[in-house]
Regions:
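Active-site-proximal beta-strand elements of phosphoester/diester hydrolases
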Residues: 21-34, 156-165, 209, 280-286
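His/acidic metal-ligating clusters that form di-metal
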Residues: 53-56, 158-161, 172-267
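Extended active-site neighborhood of metal-dependent phosphoesterases/phosphodiesterases
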Residues: 8, 12-13, 75-196, 200-201, ...
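N-terminal active-site segment of His-dependent metallophosphoesterases
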Residues: 2-76
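Binuclear metal-dependent phosphoesterase catalytic core
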Residues: 145-153, 249-256, 270-330
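Active-site neighborhood of phospho(di)ester-bond hydrolases with catalytic His/Asp-centered motifs
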Residues: 26-28, 58-63, 88-94, 208-210, ...
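Acidic/histidine-rich helix-loop elements
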Residues: 25-43, 65-72, 98-111, 169-176, ...
């Protein structure tokens, strides 16, 4: 597979995967910038994916917009998602803040510009958005969870949404999960196990969604080359936006045994998916038309099964094409 991963895609009419109880569409890095022509391409791609696959939920893993006039763009895309009238979740990326784009003493228009807290409050006001700001004593904005249940109310899987912050000035690189977030994650997993199964050691399957990928994404990619551990998708050479430090979050996931899949964004040119230590590490596909000339845009369809397991399918919109290519179930 050389410097790249691989995946077999094929054109076909969409058919729901067998034994699917719940479908989630992951989208990421849409970077709405109030550019009517470019933004329209994002809206069209997302609308096409939703109408084709009819997901039960949409999760956007960060970088909905960038810093300049972010509130205008943010509200526009949120309104668009609300109109699908299905639940949708959100995790903050590294571009929703204001510290990069504006001078310290610059006068900002509150109707057009917003800090993270204002964006968080806005998300919580929306009727279809499941976002929660989370515990104020835990670092980050938007550490929360959502239980997916079957028709009888049985919890099939827990969706863990977490904030990976923005820039780590101390280590001069992208930020990571902080210690009290990892503690929150552990407490959440054990609390759900106790509530659902009466024993905190009997964990419920979970999937984690966040923006900046853990360092293990790159480790897993390198370890998989030349082995039977099949790589799905694509890695752009030297595209590595993982954190500056190892935060030990992955080790905690392995220790607890609940989280079976992680879904990140951030690295616009990467969309690979690979197994490591029993956890599927998956990049979403960037839908950005403003920052990078990404050749493949689209999303990841997550098919949660009746036993709590899951599969994924890449949904691809090739540059210059209006149709969606449906990937094989993985």
């Amino acid at each position: 597979i050389g410097s790249f991963g691989f995946v077999t895609f094929y054109h076909k009419d969409y058919k729901e995967a067998d034994d699917t109880a719940y479908k989630i569409l992951q989208i990421t890095d849409v970077h709405i910038l109030n550019d009517e022509k470019k933004d329209a391409k994002v809206y069209k791609t997302v609308k096409n994916m939703v109408e084709t696959t009819k997901p039960d939920m949409i999760i956007l893993t960060g970088d909905l917009t960038s810093e300049k006039e972010n509130f205008t763009a943010f509200k526009s895309f949120c309104s668009f998602l609300e109109d699908f009238n299905i639940p949708w979740g959100f995790t903050f990326g590294n571009h929703e803040g204001l510290d990069i784009a504006y001078e310290k003493n610059e006068v900002l228009d509150p109707e057009k510009i917003a800090d993270r807290q204002t964006l968080s409050d806005y998300l919580e006001s929306l009727s279809n958005c499941i976002y929660e700001a989370g515990d104020e004593n835990v670092d980050g904005t938007g550490n929360y969870y959502y239980n997916v249940t079957d028709d009888n109310g049985k919890v099939l899987t827990t969706l863990i949404m977490m904030d990976t912050h923005s820039w780590d000035k101390e280590n001069n690189g992208y930020d990571h999960f902080h210690d009290n977030q990892i503690e929150w994650y552990e407490n959440t997993i054990k609390s759900i196990a106790k509530e659902v199964n009466g024993d905190e050691s009997k964990v419920v399957p979970s999937l984690a969604f966040f923006h900046v990928p853990m360092k293990e994404y790159m480790t897993a990619y390198e370890e998989a080359k030349g082995t039977d551990n099949r790589l799905w998708g694509y890695r752009f050479p030297n595209e590595d936006g993982t954190p500056a430090v190892d935060d030990m979050m992955f080790e905690k996931m392995v220790e607890l045994g609940s989280t079976k899949g992680c879904f990140a964004g951030h690295d616009h040119m990467n969309n690979f998916s690979v197994m490591k230590d029993g956890i599927r590490l998956t990049y979403g596909l960037s839908d950005d038309h403003n920052i990078y000339l990404t050749p493949l845009r689209g999303g990841i369809l997550i098919n949660i099964k009746n036993d709590g397991s899951f599969t994924t399918q890449h949904l691809i919109r090739h540059r210059g094409q209006n149709t969606i290519t449906i990937g094989k179930e993985q």
